[in-house]
Amino acid sequence: MNIYAVGGAIRDELLGMPVQDRDYVVVGATPEQMIAQGFRPVGKDFPVFLHPDTQEEYALARTERKTSAGYHGFQFFYAPDVTLEDDLARRDLTINAMAREVTPDGALIGPVIDPFNGREDLEHRVFRHVSDAFLEDPVRILRVARFSARFADFSVAPETLALMRKMVEAGEVDALVPERVWQEVSRGLMEKKPSRMFEVLRDCGALARVLPEIDALYGVPQRADYHPEVDTGVHVMMVVDHAAAQNYALAVRFAALTHDLGKATTPEDVLPRHIGHEGRSVDLLKPLCERLRVPNECRDLALLVAREHGNIHRVMETKAAGLVRLFERSDALRKPARFAEALQACEADARGRLGFEANAYPQAERLRQALVAARAVDAGAVAKSYENSPAEIKDAVHRERVRAVAKALNEAPSGQA
């Protein structure tokens, strides 16, 4: 029995990056031998075991064969005579198909085992498939795109990109289940440069299949005085990358990605203006979230930002009454943390423009100050003073909040948005 650390741990070690998790492959063992040594079986489709002390996963060396469409359609084969190279050959990219032997307690020993020249591809910053078996698993398209967001200076080998395009044309991507698409897209959004993920998906044609709403934004012009980058798709990628650079949460990054969906459906005769695109964005975003089964937290923030980002951008001219109405529409009085995330997405939107990247965004501070004042109003006390006129309570609380906001901003309470 020989044990090897494989995959990402070896890749990251060679890149000088911290190794978060290790995957282990066991060669020359049977399930019975693993159990006899105290390992606990947990795998459903193939033998995976938890180490009795570290609880790390150890898998028996295996090969796989495609049996049907999609990423579930595989049959696995494992036996003591399956070699390490057999196991590495089924992996997606050469940079993930390297190994090092380890001792039973997990200490690395011996040289890097690299049968597919992954080390050379690491040095040249290239994503290259191990074999034509890459064609059999459409998730690998999403993984290459996600790795591109993590390792932004890597390129996809031309022959690998050609395989990815072939898979898209064959409809393999269409067999992906929504949860897996969301899993990979959300992980890519949390990488250093998410725009690279969407660039790779677009290059191979997969973006139009998995996120047609994003693909449709490319080539849609915007007013050059507001958007020197002009292309809406380029703008959205700048917004997402800004959100990533600020280390914002996933919900903020997803809102940044989807805030301008409605610009793709702007009538051509009114371009490059996009009047009413906020409402159209909401209409497109709802079915997108349903289709990908986006978590409620991400969906709700994205809908809020899509609907209100234009109003938030204009708040420097908005009076106290309009600010309070914005808070009421956005449920900011009950959910200030979510509203704070909406401001992050809007700031990313404002800065995700060519030449605007370092500009101040005073709208955020104005709204934060106003929200503190509005939330400080004791709605219960106001309600008590109107206990004989309950129908008037809502308007009375609103008026008190307007007065409080106006005072905080040193403005008159009258005025509209």
UniProtKB/Swiss-Prot annotation:
Record carries keyword Oxidoreductase: no
Entry's Gene Ontology molecular function annotations: ATP binding; CCA tRNA nucleotidyltransferase activity; cyclic-nucleotide phosphodiesterase activity; magnesium ion binding; phosphatase activity; tRNA binding
UniProt keyword annotations, A-Z: ATP-binding, Hydrolase, Magnesium, Metal-binding, Multifunctional enzyme, Nickel, Nucleotide-binding, Nucleotidyltransferase, RNA repair, RNA-binding, Transferase, tRNA processing
Swiss-Prot/TrEMBL cofactor(s): Mg(2+); Ni(2+)
Keyword Membrane: no
Organism: Paraburkholderia phymatum (strain DSM 17167 / CIP 108236 / LMG 21445 / STM815) (Burkholderia phymatum)
Gene (UniProt): cca
Note: A single active site specifically recognizes both ATP and CTP and is responsible for their addition.
Domain HD span(s) in chain numbering: 232-333
InterPro entries given in the database record: CCA_bact, HD/PDEase_dom, HD_domain, NT_sf, PolA_pol_head_dom, PolyA_RNA-bd, tRNA_CCA-adding_enzyme
Assembly information from the UniProt record: Monomer. Can also form homodimers and oligomers.
Domain description: Comprises two domains: an N-terminal domain containing the nucleotidyltransferase activity and a C-terminal HD domain associated with both phosphodiesterase and phosphatase activities.
Function: Catalyzes the addition and repair of the essential 3'-terminal CCA sequence in tRNAs without using a nucleic acid template. Adds these three nucleotides in the order of C, C, and A to the tRNA nucleotide-73, using CTP and ATP as substrates and producing inorganic pyrophosphate. tRNA 3'-terminal CCA addition is required both for tRNA processing and repair. Also involved in tRNA surveillance by mediating tandem CCA addition to generate a CCACCA at the 3' terminus of unstable tRNAs. While stable tRNAs receive only 3'-terminal CCA, unstable tRNAs are marked with CCACCA and rapidly degraded.
Superkingdom of origin: Bacteria
Residues reported in the UniProt entry to bind Mg(2+): 21, 23
NCBIfam families recorded: PRK10885.1
Catalytic activity: a tRNA precursor + 2 CTP + ATP = a tRNA with a 3' CCA end + 3 diphosphate; a tRNA with a 3' CCA end + 2 CTP + ATP = a tRNA with a 3' CCACCA end + 3 diphosphate
Name of this chain's protein: Multifunctional CCA protein
Family: Belongs to the tRNA nucleotidyltransferase/poly(A) polymerase family. Bacterial CCA-adding enzyme type 1 subfamily.
Textual note on the cofactor: Magnesium is required for nucleotidyltransferase activity. Nickel for phosphatase activity.
